[in-house]
């Protein structure tokens, strides 16, 4: 009879202690916020795809791809011949160009 009395008092106490102490149920479901945030912190972060990591311009186009196309079109020149002559002309008109340094 005494054994049943102790078990009657001990079983709810042990169950209550296990639930609050571990913070989980039988299947690993989180009961407390503290345990759920710890579990979230252990999850790996998603890896960014290349397209998500690249910046885009106002039209939503990929800047890196656009720059590659422009450079491929220009060839080995830093600027195309037309761009270079327009740049020289603008600088001459603005008076910021020293004519002795450029042809």
UniProtKB/Swiss-Prot annotation:
- One term of GO molecular function: metal ion binding
Q: Which domain of life is it from?
A: Eukaryota
Q: In which tissues is it expressed?
A: Expressed by the venom duct.
Cofactors that this protein relies on:
Ca(2+); Mg(2+)
Q: Which residues form the propeptide?
A: 22-79
- Spell out the Basic and acidic residues composition-biased ranges: 55-64
> Where found?
Secreted
Q: What function is annotated for this protein?
A: Conantokins inhibit N-methyl-D-aspartate (NMDA) receptors. This toxin inhibits NR2 subunits N-methyl-D-aspartate (NMDA) receptor-mediated calcium influx in central nervous system neurons in the following order of preference: NR2B/GRIN2B (IC(50)=0.14 uM), NR2D/GRIN2D (IC(50)=0.31 uM), NR2A/GRIN2A (IC(50)=0.68 uM) and NR2C/GRIN2A (IC(50)=4.9 uM), when tested on rat receptors.
Q: Other notes on this protein?
A: The mature peptide does not contain cysteine residue.
| The protein, known as | Conantokin-Br
Organism, as annotated: Conus sulcatus (Sulcate cone)
């Amino acid at each position: 009879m005494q054994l049943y009395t102790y078990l009657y008092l001990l079983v709810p106490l042990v169950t209550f202690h296990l639930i609050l102490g571990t913070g989980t149920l039988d299947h690993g479901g989180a009961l407390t916020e503290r345990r759920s945030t710890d579990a979230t912190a252990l999850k790996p972060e998603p890896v960014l795809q290349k397209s998500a990591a690249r910046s885009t311009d106002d039209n939503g186009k990929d800047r890196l791809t656009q720059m590659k196309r422009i450079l491929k079109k220009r060839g080995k020149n830093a600027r195309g011949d037309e761009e270079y002559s327009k740049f020289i002309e603008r600088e001459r008109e603005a008076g910021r160009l020293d004519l002795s340094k450029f042809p």
